[in-house]
């Protein structure tokens, strides 16, 4: 039985428009059984990713390449 892992990141994503821009990227990175969401009301603009196989560094790199700060907590 595979279980999902929850990854938590501090990001510089601050606006819903930025989340919409990142949606295709995050949907492609996270497998079908996973999910992701931003908490833009949190002071650290938290990104939570629930996935079975995706390494945290893949998320960090993908956001950084697009100009956003991202670090795993």
Named regions from a protein language model:
Residues 1-15:
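Short glycine-/aliphatic-rich beta-strand segments at the starts of folded cytosolic domains
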Residues 32-38, 71:
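A short linear hydrophobic-aromatic micro-motif
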Residues 12-31:
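Short amphipathic alpha-helix segments
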Residues 6-10, 23-24, 50-73:
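C-terminal structural segments of small proteins and small subunits
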Residues 38-39, 55:
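Poly-acidic low-complexity segments
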Residues 40-44:
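Short Gly/Ser/Thr- and Asp/Glu-enriched loop/turn motifs at secondary-structure junctions
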Residues 45-49:
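A generic structural motif
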Residues 4, 31-33, 63:
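Alpha-helical structural elements
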């Amino acid at each position: 039985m595979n279980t999902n892992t929850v990854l938590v990141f501090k990001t510089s994503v601050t606006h819903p428009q930025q989340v919409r821009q990142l949606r295709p990227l995050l949907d492609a990175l996270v497998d079908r059984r996973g999910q992701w969401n931003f908490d833009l009301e949190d002071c650290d603009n938290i990104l939570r990713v629930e996935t079975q196989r995706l390494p945290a560094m893949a998320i960090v790199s993908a956001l950084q390449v697009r100009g956003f700060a991202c670090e795993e907590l």
